[in-house]
Swiss-Prot record:
Protein's recorded name: NAD(P)H-dependent pentose reductase
Gene name, Swiss-Prot/TrEMBL: PRD1
Coiled coil: none
Keyword hit for Transferase: no
Residue sites binding substrate per the record: H112
InterPro entries the UniProt entry points to: AKR (IPR020471), NADP_OxRdtase_dom (IPR023210), NADP_OxRdtase_dom_sf (IPR036812)
Molecular function GO terms recorded: aldo-keto reductase (NADPH) activity
One Pfam family this sequence matches: Aldo_ket_red
């Protein structure tokens, strides 16, 4: 039987294939999440910054109310945004996000970026992103909150024997480099369960992957299709690389296995125990994505795909104005 989940260092099982709700329109999120669960998805990956947590929770609750799944069958992820890194604000936002989803607890809560911005209350401006106004007339100042402070706040919310009412099951990070994780590792009482990173054949990051595996930190890959995830955002680097779906290497492997390019890209990750969270608005593609664990690539095929690595990163705050350097 194909492997469909991995065990986190927190003791919980995490599905290898999830449904990501980044860029899912708010008015379509509830139905999209419901449809994904009905098709067999058991992990939903969200974030406060995606602005659709309320609607995602509605889709989850509908699936539970209709008897499709039980709450304990699902693995729900959300993320702490940059304006809420101080201890009291991290706790405030984690509780807010749990309440917004309306499903009792979150299975995984991540620090979205190793970036601490000046606090902006949710009541003043929901979803402030990197700017304190929708016109983007000025950037939000950095706050320089130590990551250890933020982490300690999240630790206080984790369900444990001594904290049975904790609203988080596991905690982790996203977009963290090895050195920052090393610093966090030294002070953390609860070790990060997951690091969610940009990972695709054009950005393999083998040294970071090795570090995470050595430390027992699970890996979730976002933007598994590389440039495809950023076409609608008019990202300047998209036009400088071959779309992965049409790349000769990917096409040849897909044709050999009778699979789609998307399935090959997802299997390249999941076969190495890397969790994937693709998004699709198409039911057939949702089914295909979920089915990516039902075949295996050869070691040579995995290497061929990995050899496409050219260090191209699409999600980089250094591209902002002003730039924020977290990967240099």
């Amino acid at each position: 039987m194909a492997k469909t989940s991995i065990k986190l260092n927190s003791g919980y099982e995490m599905p290898l294939v999830g449904f990501g709700i980044w860029k899912v329109p708010v008015d379509k999120t509830a139905q999209a999440v419901y449809d994904a669960i009905k098709l067999g998805y058991r992990q939903i990956d969200g974030a406060y910054d995606y602005t659709n947590s309320k609607e995602a929770g509605e889709g989850v609750r509908r699936a539970i109310e209709e008897g499709i799944v039980k709450r304990e069958d699902l693995f729900i992820t959300s993320k702490l945004w940059n304006n809420y890194h101080k201890h009291e604000h991290a706790i405030e936002m984690a509780k807010h996000e749990v309440d917004t989803w309306g499903i009792g607890y979150l299975d995984l809560f991540l620090i979205h970026f190793p970036i601490s911005l000046e606090y902006i209350s949710h009541s003043k401006m929901p979803y402030p992103c990197f700017w304190p106004d929708r016109e983007k007339s000025r950037s939000t100042p950095l706050q320089y909150t130590p990551v250890a402070e933020t982490w300690a706040a999240l630790e206080s919310l984790v369900k444990t024997d001594s904290n049975p009412d904790g609203i988080l099951r596991s905690i982790g990070v996203a977009n963290f480099r090895a050195q920052l994780l090393t610093d966090l590792w030294g002070s953390a009482k609860i070790k990060p369960a997951v690091n969610q990173i940009e990972h695709h054949p054009y950005l393999v990051q083998p040294q970071l992957l090795a570090f995470l595996k050595d430390h027992g930190i699970a890996i979730t890959a976002y933007s598994s299709f590389g440039p495809q995830s950023f076409v609608e955002l008019d990202h300047p680097r998209v036009s400088k690389v071959e779309p992965l779906f049409t790349h000769p290497t990917i096409k040849a492997i897909a044709d050999k296995h009778g699979r789609t390019g998307a399935q090959v890209l997802l299997r390249w990750a999941t076969q190495r125990d890397i969790v994937v969270i693709p998004k699709s608005n198409n039911v057939d593609r949702l089914k295909q994505n979920l089915d990516c664990v039902s075949f295996d690539l050869s070691d040579d095929e995995v290497k061929q795909i990995s050899d496409l690595d050219c260090g191209v990163r699409f999600n980089d705050p250094a591209d902002l104005s002003p730039p924020i350097y977290i990967f240099d």
